[in-house]
């Protein structure tokens, strides 16, 4: 968005591009996220390969009920992996000639309250300093941006949930053409997908469980039980090629702005992945921040920056 408005940016990441593009992440995009990607000019492949869903199903008490999103809200969601979104954004940056640096270390946001903030980092054993106007801290829960805010200013609120979230990827067609959220006495289950031939399935598990305790046979048996017989009858099982257990937490930090530093996404707030909200909230943050910075640079209007993160904003 900033590049389209003629605003130069530099992207720093402590991981390699190969590592970033190989991570398994979120896959359900809300309407506002799709609109933001359209505005950024990176939605061509999304529209070609994404899977539009008009609703989803809830399964509980031995029955399942479809919720008609399009009918009730006039909006749909799109299944398109975060990994693919990232690839599209990287390709757009390359096309636009925007700078980005991977495998950086010892990143330090500095002089945040001054008119000339900077970011120090080390790459290939050499130290660099980037002078800038503003810093967007989009570096996730474990990044350095949030902790650059002084301890006497930063407030955090969090809750760790007493269960884990076991997810697998399998190259089998999805059990249902839309997502299925299943409530069962054994725990929650979610049937999602990444494509018409690749499925992403989850079950709630004990917080102390390990992946080795969940061989595929055990997963499929438990997943089928929680889905219920009607849906499970359509389930195609097979060998998973990706399996992990994630702890579930909720987390909020404030303020999201300190001087010339703005936090966005998981750096500022985390919600459990069960609702597919994390990526969508992050892009909503960036959409608001981009609008504010574009107004600053193209119109000399700082009203949006002054109000950013301090008052309710529409998230369409």
What are these regions (language model features)?
Residues 277-283:
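A conserved FAD-binding loop/helix module that cradles the flavin
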Residues 247-262:
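FAD-binding beta-loop-beta segment adjacent to the flavin cofactor pocket
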Residues 3-24:
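Glycine-rich FAD pyrophosphate-binding loop
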Residues 259-272:
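Short FAD-binding loop at a beta-strand-to-alpha-helix junction that anchors the flavin cofactor
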Residues 283-302:
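Internal hydrophobic alpha-helix adjacent to the cofactor/substrate pocket in enzyme cavities
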Residues 22-25, 30-92, 96:
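Active-site-adjacent segment of FAD-dependent monooxygenases/related oxidoreductases
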Residues 91, 95-248:
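Conserved FAD-binding catalytic core of PHBH/FMO-like flavoproteins
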Residues 309-316:
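Conserved small/polar residues in nucleotide/adenosyl-binding loops
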């Amino acid at each position: 968005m900033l590049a389209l408005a003629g605003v130069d940016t530099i992207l720093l990441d402590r991981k390699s591009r190969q590592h970033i593009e190989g991570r398994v992440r979120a896959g359900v995009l809300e309407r506002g996220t799709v609109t933001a990607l359209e505005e950024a000019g990176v939605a061509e492949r999304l529209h070609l390969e994404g899977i539009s869903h008009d609703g989803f199903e809830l399964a509980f008490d031995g029955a399942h009920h479809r919720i008609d999103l399009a009918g009730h809200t006039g909006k749909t969601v799109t299944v398109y992996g975060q990994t693919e979104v990232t690839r599209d954004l990287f390709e757009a940056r390359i096309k636009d000639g925007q700078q980005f640096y991977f495998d950086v270390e010892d990143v330090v946001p500095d002089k945040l309250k001054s008119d000339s903030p900077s970011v120090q980092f080390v790459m290939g054993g050499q130290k660099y300093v980037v002078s800038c106007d503003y810093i967007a801290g989009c570096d996730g829960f474990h990044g350095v941006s949030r902790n650059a805010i002084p301890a006497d200013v930063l407030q955090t609120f969090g809750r760790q949930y007493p269960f884990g979230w076991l997810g697998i990827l399998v190259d089998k067609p999805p059990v249902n053409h839309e997502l299925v959220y299943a409530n069962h006495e054994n725990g929650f289950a979610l049937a999602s997908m990444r494509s018409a031939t690749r499925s992403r399935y989850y079950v709630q598990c004990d917080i102390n469980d390990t992946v080795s305790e969940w061989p595929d046979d055990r997963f499929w048996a438990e997943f089928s039980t929680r889905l219920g017989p009607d849906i499970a009858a359509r389930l195609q099982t097979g060998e998973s090629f990706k399996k992990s257990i994630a702890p579930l937490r909720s987390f909020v930090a404030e303020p999201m702005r300190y001087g010339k530093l703005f936090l966005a996404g998981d750096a500022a707030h985390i919600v459990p992945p069960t609702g597919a909200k994390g990526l969508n909230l992050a892009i909503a943050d960036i959409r608001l921040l981009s609008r504010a910075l574009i107004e600053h640079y193209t119109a000399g209007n700082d009203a949006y920056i002054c109000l950013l993160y301090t008052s309710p904003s529409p998230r369409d």
